[in-house]
Amino acid sequence: MLDLKFILNNKNEVIKKLSTRNYDLANITKINNLGEMRSKLIFELEKLQAKRNKLSDEIGIKKRNNENCDSLIEEVNAIKAQIEKVDHEADDIISQVNDILTKIPNLPYDDVPVGSDELDNKVIKEHASLGRGLVKGVEAHYDIATKLDIIDFTRAVKLAQTRFVLYKNAGAKLIRALANFMLDTHINNGYKEIMPAHLVNSKMLFGTGQLPKFKDDLFRVSDSDLWLIPTAEVPLTNYHYDEILNLNEPIKYVAYTKCFRSEAGSGGRDTRGIIRQHEFHKVELVKIVRQEDAMGEWEKMVNDAKNILTLLELPYREILLCTGDMGFSSAKTIDLEIWIPSEQRYRETSSISICKDFQARRAKIRYKDADGKTKYAFTMNGSGVAIDRVMAAILENYQNSDGTITVPKVLVPYMNGITKIEAK
């Protein structure tokens, strides 16, 4: 959430940056107007309170002198009613302002490319020579997985509905291997592992920015205030909800969880395979840092995510997202897109975002600087990485002409020594 004072004092800058984020700028004008109205009400409130206090003093004097003060008491009661009315109007304005504030996206850094959608994103670097390079002419992951009997799509639909899958045999083992490999790698790089619950309350989803704006993208437990997590970013960041932290060293967390998304608005995209599911597996990275340390720590996080794909020897590219394609809470995002041979294109497998103090304001995560001043922390998060999409990439990039799948070298120890997945 943006700071209201910053918006009011830097209206032109805010409008300029939000104009690049497909945001309705009329709301900024509305906030300014509401701010002016509230200032007038507060001025009126202060005058009424001063008048009430003066009359109350006069009543006290008259009572001590045994003089009649009925008319003054009536006047004070009338002023109290006015104060209550003005107070209510001011509270209503605050409610309107907060409602707008909660739905304003983060302001992008100055070096983020301006654009309206993914077509305006900027390719930073391509790592096309990793592994076997940009493979062509292979079976789609969903076809080869069915032949190898490692994913069951049909029974998953029977058990639930479309966009769910059942991993089995070597497929289940590969999912576990990927998760454990990623966790071990990140833990060795200084992240602390947390295993959170898959359910959180609405206050936590507000903290990281999913609510109220993206309610339709979430799964909610009926008749309760519990929601399935769309990403472990939610519990990891809100782990320090409403706390003042010691940030002499960055706080670094990693978690492997299931994630749940309704995929509202995805329509008929990616209806086959494991690219887009309602329930999927992901290793998530979160850092909470001092403001001055943020950019350096974010760049390290980008490298931590890249390291996973490099070790797996899977071709990928780095994309700097434009202003119109970034997530709601992000001030700058780099996507890592992995090569999917059957589609002959790259697909996102990680987004690494720095959020400035946007989430920390919502979640009230603070720290004390060297001078003892309390400040909002800076937060960042990134997929480290999305496991199902990596599995799809392995099934295609490591596919052999005899219909088997070579297990990436770094995963062999996690696969009990299995070097090849083949039909049983």
From Swiss-Prot:
GO terms for biological process: selenocysteine biosynthetic process; seryl-tRNA aminoacylation. Catalyzes the attachment of serine to tRNA(Ser). Is also able to aminoacylate tRNA(Sec) with serine, to form the misacylated tRNA L-seryl-tRNA(Sec), which will be further converted into selenocysteinyl-tRNA(Sec). It is an enzyme of class 6 (ligase). It comes from the Bacteria. This is Serine--tRNA ligase. Homodimer. The tRNA molecule binds across the dimer. ATP binds at residues 261-263, 348-351. InterPro entries: aa-tRNA-synt_IIb, aa-tRNA-synth_II, aa-tRNA-synth_II/BPL/LPL, Ser-tRNA-ligase_type_1, Ser-tRNA-synth_1_N, SerRS_1_N_sf, SerRS_core, tRNA-bd_arm. L-serine binds at residues 231-233, 284, 383. Keywords: Aminoacyl-tRNA synthetase, ATP-binding, Cytoplasm, Ligase, Nucleotide-binding, Protein biosynthesis.
